[in-house]
């Protein structure tokens, strides 16, 4: 993007004072890409996930007397945990193996606590087999995102 100084002949050290001469609008794909790669969006994902988990814990107390109501509060909690992990994985554009290991631990521990309140590895959704099955997908997405970051 080229800029022209506000006052002709006088350069500006602050780019905010310069006027853009590029009149080409951003395409929808570029705008969405900029939004999804912004730090604010990624932090927002983590915050929304935390709010879902907190809301679930609040509703667990009131739903303790209903046997079937546990599924109504477990679903938002699992979605919140997944949302937190997506936010963690997408920070800085790529997923390192350490981050993926951290996310697997967060998902397994969260499900353990939500299902019966104890950490006893009684997982049914986030099992080692299921999480290991998507290792290749996470790895390929990480490589793709790191290549995109290098080109920018």
UniProtKB/Swiss-Prot annotation:
Gene (UniProt): srp
Membrane association type: Multi-pass membrane protein
KW Transmembrane (keyword) present: yes
Entry keyword set: Membrane, Transmembrane, Transmembrane helix
Stored InterPro entries: CRPA (IPR008436)
Protein name from the UniProt record: Sulfur-rich protein, serovar C
Location of the protein in the cell: Membrane
Pfam families per the UniProt record, alphabetical: CRPA
Transmembrane parts of this sequence: 43-63, 69-89
Membrane is among the record's keywords: yes
GO cellular component: outer membrane
Sequence segments annotated as region (Disordered): 1-20
């Amino acid at each position: 993007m080229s800029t022209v100084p506000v006052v002709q002949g006088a350069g500006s050290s602050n780019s905010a004072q310069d006027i853009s001469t590029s009149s080409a609008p951003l395409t929808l794909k570029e705008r969405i890409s900029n939004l999804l790669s912004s730090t604010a969006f990624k932090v927002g994902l983590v915050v929304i996930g935390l709010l879902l988990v907190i809301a679930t814990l609040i509703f667990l107390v009131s739903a303790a007397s209903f046997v079937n109501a546990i599924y109504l509060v477990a679903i938002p909690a699992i979605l919140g945990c997944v949302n937190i992990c997506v936010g963690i994985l997408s920070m800085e554009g790529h997923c390192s193996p350490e981050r993926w290991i951290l996310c697997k631990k967060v998902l397994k521990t969260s499900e353990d606590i939500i299902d019966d309140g104890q950490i006893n590895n009684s997982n049914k959704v986030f099992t080692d087999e299921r999480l290991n099955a998507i290792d290749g997908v996470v790895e390929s997405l990480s490589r793709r995102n790191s290549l995109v970051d290098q080109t920018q």
